[in-house]
Structure formats: C-alpha cells, structure tokens
C-alpha cells in the first residue's frame, strides 16, 4: 500500500484549479503536525513589536513589503489575512520560503512569515526579530513570542487553524482493516516519548493530539477549507468558487 504525507495545500487544489483532487479522495490516518508560521523582521529593522509594524502598515498602505514563496502558499495566505483585517502590504513573491526569509535578512523586504522549522537557527543567531506567532496561541518552544491574536483579537477566526499542516493519508480504496492497523500504529508512535521529544525539539504543533476520531478529523478539514479556500477566492487568488465544491463559508 502507498502511504502519503501531504501538505495542507491539497485542500485548495480544486478551487485553485490545479487538479481534481481533494482531501475527500483520501482516507486520513491522522493529521500529524503543524509547522507554525512566525512573523519576523530583520535584526536592524526599526520595528520591535507587532503593533509597531501594524501601525506603520496603516500609516503607509501598500508601502510596507512582505515576502512570500508564491500565490496560494501558506505565507501568501497570511498576507491575504492581513488584507482582510485592513492591513494593505506590498506582497513580493520569491522562488522559495528560504529565499523570502533571506530577503528580510538582507534588507530587501520589511517582513516575512516563515515556518519555525526553518527559522529557529536565525532566531538563535539574532539575524531576525520574531514579532508574533501567526496563530491564536503561543508556541511551547518559544513562549516569549506572542500570538498574533494578542495584538489583533479579531484575527482569531482566521488563525484557529495551522497554516502549514502535514497529514498522513492513504487512498480511499485501502481496506478498512489496513486503515485500522495504520491508525493503531500511529497512535502507538504518538504515545512514544521519543516521538514526543522530537516534536518538541522541532517546535512543531502536535495537531494529532487534538483530532483523534473520524468526526473530529473531518470537522477539522472542513473548517480549514472554509477559512482558506474562501480567503483565496475572495481575494482573486483561487479560480473557482468554493461553493462549486460544497465548501461553506466560516460560520455557515
């Protein structure tokens, strides 16, 4: 049997008109981990807090620059969230997330929002200043970095989901007895202290702890699509309406 560890972007393939695949084409063994996004500026930036940066964006609409790795990606989605919240930034696309980060370190752009898995070393070296976790909660590994919603509470409806999520899935044709074995094996791994320490050391968000049964897993993915697919469509990024695929807006 072929197993797949997939990224969250599969939930947008249809609305982005990339291909006719979605979460419902697969059986989810478990969400794995989220890789939290952190809003950072360069070490020499004049901005020392999220509020200072947001004030500058308000005072200079469309002038403060934000780098990302391309339309439809998690970093770009966060730029769309800022837009929805009334913060107009100049979004600049780079070839990769790492290039987007180096653009900030090199002073080419004002800020970006990389994953913590690629950012930790730059925080430790002092090359960047982390202003906020792009989430509604702080990270255990970096408890001094405030959550974005501590400064902008109204962002909570967009930030109660992981923006970079890995999931463990199999084809829908996989026999149920095989799915059951894989789920049991996954639960055994998740309970292993070695795995728990690995997740902690990498500052990952243990999403698997929150969603264990099929109903909660389905609700999780439905909510993710409601947030992201409509966010992209309303901002002209997605080609097709989420309504075509039965994706409801938040709160519907």
Sequence positions of predicted segments:
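C-terminal lobe and pocket-closing loops
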Residues: 120-190, 239-244, 248-252
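Hinge/capping helix and adjacent helix->loop/strand transition within the periplasmic-binding protein
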Residues: 1-2, 14-99, 148, 165-198
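Short, Asp-centered acidic motifs that coordinate Mg2+ and/or phosphate
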Residues: 2-4, 38, 110-111, 130
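Short secondary-structure boundary segments
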Residues: 8, 43, 116-117, 135, ...
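Short beta-strand segments
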Residues: 4-7, 240
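Mobile beta-alpha loop/short-helix "lid" or hinge segments that flank ligand
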Residues: 29-30, 154-162, 196-207
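Ligand-binding pocket segment of bilobal, Venus flytrap-like solute-binding proteins
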Residues: 63, 67-145
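An extracytoplasmic/periplasmic, membrane-proximal ligand-sensing/linker region
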Residues: 124, 177-252
